[in-house]
């Protein structure tokens, strides 16, 4: 493994958002000479690596850079730096046009672009004006299927579950308020800067567990009545993990969830609102779902499938360039 100069800069890992300009430079300075194939995976700058003319560069785009394009206004409203938010807003406004020019140019460098969902494929066309192929990301579905965990202690007989970083765009606030209004217990696993504000709107129905070990996440998923997913994601790994656990998903009908959650495995909610999720929770009937069907759906996103599709793309791309 080869690292860049950013490895030695304090806070570059914990607060990487503050170092976007340096990240661009770091990727451009990587020595990638002599390789036949280079595969980059990116949500921002990694697609901007510079390769030899004879090198095939395939870039797996998890999303066009969110804070520059699709979610620019949202990042301005909630930068996520606490007391440094005013400084972050000023910096983003000051640099966004220059950053967009670099980001667009960087997206023209790879020979092949892969999108992690049809939703992202549309964004790639919109912001980068390039065609791409959809290869859904790998989900470790076997981890959630290989063994059944005992029911966690001190949990309600029935409960909704949310597993997420606690940041604004995940919309865990909708899950909390909807469960409180519906009178349905909710367990939230995860940490993040929004925890304090979420606690303020939570009532007796909601438990915040913070970060827990993997085996407990698996257990809570396996025994939940349903998994709540009120945010809009580019793909969304956790809904597939829920399906692999045999647990249906109640998700907002936008983004990657529309490609993973079908009627036979969950509920898609048309509006991203508390009222809409309250209705979905009140009308939800867990007995309508078959765990075997849910797990079969999850297996469509397995590691083996991902490897096979990626190998196919590499072979086809190499053949096309002779």
Regions found by a protein language model. Name each.
Residues 210, 263-274, 281-288:
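Conserved acidic donor-binding segment of nucleotide-sugar-dependent glycosyltransferases
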Residues 126, 133, 139-156:
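Acidic anion/phosphate-binding donor-loop and adjacent secondary structure
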Residues 1-47:
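Active-site donor-binding segments of glycosyltransferases and PAPS-dependent sulfotransferases
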Residues 196-216:
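Nucleotide-activated donor-binding/catalytic signature segment of Leloir-type glycosyltransferases, i.e.
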């Amino acid at each position: 493994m080869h690292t860049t100069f950013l490895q030695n800069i304090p806070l570059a890992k914990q607060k990487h958002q503050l170092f976007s300009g340096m990240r661009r430079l770091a990727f451009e300075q990587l020595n990638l000479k002599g390789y036949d194939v280079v595969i980059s995976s990116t949500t921002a700058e990694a697609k901007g690596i510079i390769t030899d003319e004879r090198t095939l560069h395939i870039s797996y785009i998890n999303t066009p850079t969110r804070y520059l394009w699709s979610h620019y206004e949202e990042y301005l409203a909630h930068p996520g730096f606490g007391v440094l938010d005013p400084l972050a807003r000023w910096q983003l406004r000051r640099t966004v046009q220059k950053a967009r020019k670099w980001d667009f140019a960087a997206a023209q460098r790879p020979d092949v672009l892969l999108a992690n969902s049809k939703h992202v494929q549309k964004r790639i066309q919109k912001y980068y004006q390039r065609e791409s192929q959809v290869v859904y990301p790998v989900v470790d579905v076997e981890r959630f299927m290989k063994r059944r965990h005992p029911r966690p202690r001190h949990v309600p007989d029935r409960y909704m579950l949310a597993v997420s970083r606690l940041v604004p765009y995940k919309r865990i606030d909708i899950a909390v308020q909807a469960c409180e209004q519906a009178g349905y217990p909710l367990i939230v696993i995860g940490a993040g800067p929004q925890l304090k504000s979420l606690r303020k709107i939570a009532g007796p129905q909601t438990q915040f567990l913070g970060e827990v070990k993997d085996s407990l996440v698996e257990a809570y998923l396996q025994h939940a009545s349903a998994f709540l997913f009120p945010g809009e994601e580019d793909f969304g790994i956790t809904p597939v993990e829920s399906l692999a656990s045999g647990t249906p998903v109640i998700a907002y009908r936008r983004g990657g969830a529309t490609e993973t959650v079908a009627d036979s495995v969950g509920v898609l909610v048309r509006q991203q609102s508390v009222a809409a999720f309250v209705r979905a929770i009140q009308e939800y009937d867990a007995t309508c779902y078959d765990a075997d069907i849910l797990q079969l759906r999850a297996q469509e996103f397995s590691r083996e499938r991902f490897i096979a599709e990626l190998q196919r793309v590499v072979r086809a791309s190499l053949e096309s360039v002779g």
